[in-house]
Amino acid sequence: MDIMLSHFTALEAIRRQETRWILEKDRPARTHIMGNVPAEAPTDGEVAALLARSPLLAGLSRPLETLIPRGAGRRRSRLVKTHVCAQLIPAGSFLELAPGVRCVSPEHLVVQLAPLLSELELIVLLSELLGIYAVMPNVEGGMFQRRRPVTTRELIANHLDALGSFPGVAKVRRAMRHACVGSGSPRETKLSLRLGLNPARGGYGLDVLSMNAPLEVRRIHNMMKKGIRKPDILLRAPSGATRNGRALLGAAVEYDGKDHATEEAHQRDAARHNELTAIGVVEYLVTKAQYRDLAYMDGLVAQIRRDLGTPAKRKTRARARRHRELRQELYAELELIDGLNWNGLERARRRAENNDEAPGNDGWETVPVEAYGLD
């Protein structure tokens, strides 16, 4: 008996440390994997037998969400919940975790979950799958680091093309435009979104060049020795920008969530700061308290703009006030996205009821014209 994990069970399986080597190795190879959705739903007895012999499955939340084809009988019990796959899915839609146990691929998972998530939740999920971390509530820090992302923009885009008009495809395409690549933690993702999203979406509209990408530096204590620094977030400087008479590559923004840094950590921070400065990167550190302080973040971004030579667009008082409200709303909504509880659409529904808005609008489906940079 075969079983295909789907939806939130698949997400949980993809996040497990036991599956990381399957996901991180030969990512393009899985695009050629063919197969069919199991013909029928597993019985409780069959699921119980699988749980008994598979530590991976035994560690997943119940009921297990599984995929079945159209025409197969739906089932929902204490152990299993089925989802109908209404049409054929292309190669690359699943991977094998163990004999008889398959799971939808990261590329297909985001399409499955898209109708169930707000667009901001989908952006955060995509940023995790395109990043080098996995949310794991039962490990220290609530996450673990990956050696490399489990998917890429190209793999997702190719899968969307192969799916055609499959439900969820259009929403994933929209979210992909804003998703982070290379993020090292949920907080880095949220900080990058706040810095990079357009002001009409609650961001500061800065140009995020990269996240955790390697930069070659010279070690200050030994100028003959080369080294690598990987800024959490690197903001692009305009072509030809200079600072203090030197070429400016960009601005690095590092998130430091530690409440009390050690003297050794301070020394590492100082060494990194000096090495980045030497290659034309101005660096800023954002602490947990500063991240939560909207007035501080507004001032920090204003200083970054001055360093980069990219002044903010002039705004009317009304628009400036509205954009500040949106920045506060984005911060608050991101704080509610923990990677485990996906309630964004329900929150949007409640807001719509309170504001007499059209139901089903999470605030991202219809955006002001300035969101497209036309103002």
Description of each model-found segment:
Residues R146-D375:
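Surface segments flanking catalytic/ligand-binding clefts of nucleic-acid enzymes
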